[in-house]
């Protein structure tokens, strides 16, 4: 019998089994600790995704931006092309996906994202499915929000914002912040939560990035420094250095002390620079740029932390200017991610210094992998730092919630409508007055509950001030006239000053009913519900063109420390319903012509002598008799 020829289809021959059993599965390659090849696997809800399909992968990570990823694969990888469009693939929209990069038998990096977009492209009967998505930070883009934070650190604000989101999807890390001090007043105004965090990172010089698993705020770096050797994984690298002006002065104004503050770049103490290329660029910059310009720094400036803010701003600005180097490279190491430190070594094993990854793109086509990265020297302040970034805000109304300024500066605290839900309010803010100065000025402070119009210095939502007060539909003055005739000051207690242009009058009233009226026709009427007192340190003069009338319901008392003179141009009449008494040490009556005394009875009495004298005659007349009596003698001459 002829031997069976295996070339023509023998089955299960031991030689064949031994030969083909040696072929390894994909899982075997993933577990191979000696393989430098990079493999990519995907999982959704704990299950493998596109396990048996070819796909291309790209994901992009950049500091202070949303990370993104794109997968493209054949449309029939998920959908039956004879079925409805995206019949199965559409169910993956909004799902959380895990992208794993394997090398040397282990997962070197996992990127977790959310599928946010599906695109099915059909052409010539074939389809291509593009699956794109974002890091979980995209959840922070749920709509515009307005709120404020008072006396909180940057870390506390960050935790307050992210606490509203599921921790199993959006994990956060805060570590080694560049800004440690308490922030007096921080505003999120018509911004998404992510836009707000981005702005804080830019303004306060903080690294904000997603490392594939967590949203990181601060100067955190990876658990180890990743070496990239030019002879192993570093494909190519470029180094760029430049010069920038290094000298500057910041000037600001402190509201509470009423003084200007200055700090220059020489006052800032920074970390030691160990990168020799950076040191060269720094020295060259100082040789090129000599002028020290003076710039206005516009801090929050609403409390006594202004100098601390200025000090921090100068330090961060100086470090920003000393960032004179950027490195761009391409590598095959899949463990690189943003926020990591990488140490570069050239082909001759010479170190090319250590750098922080601030941007990286990963590419995998199913067969090969590489990444392209951007890095800078390891500095505390990121390259996008800008201390002149702030939330823009337009003028708007608010309600006064406190006016008892602890520093007696005439400030108030107000609450905007968007602060009411969380019972937030501004710190003490100033208000515009017609005139002000030390111990003088115009002191009109709005009452608690009153509506005011608030402006913002330079449009900065964190620098509000009161422009003035105004009425609304439910709170009117009560002084409206069709001719706009009335100008009035009316205080909380009921004190009024009313100027009436129609009448030409001025009316002043207090809560007790005391009034002062100038009627516009030459008349003044003063009314006191109780007492009226006039005091003068020297003289009081009263003049009337015609008559002066004084009336009292009971008594009128006049007193003079020395002389009391009353003069009448014609007649002087004094009437008393009861008795009339004149009391004085001496009384002298002088008439240029006649003195007439008329009464029922007239009695003259002296303790000593009575003398009657005349230059001519003395006549005594009586209708009846004249009696002259004396206790002793009577003499007539």
Regions found by a protein language model. Name each.
Residues 1-637:
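Amphipathic alpha-helical and helix-coil boundary elements used as assembly
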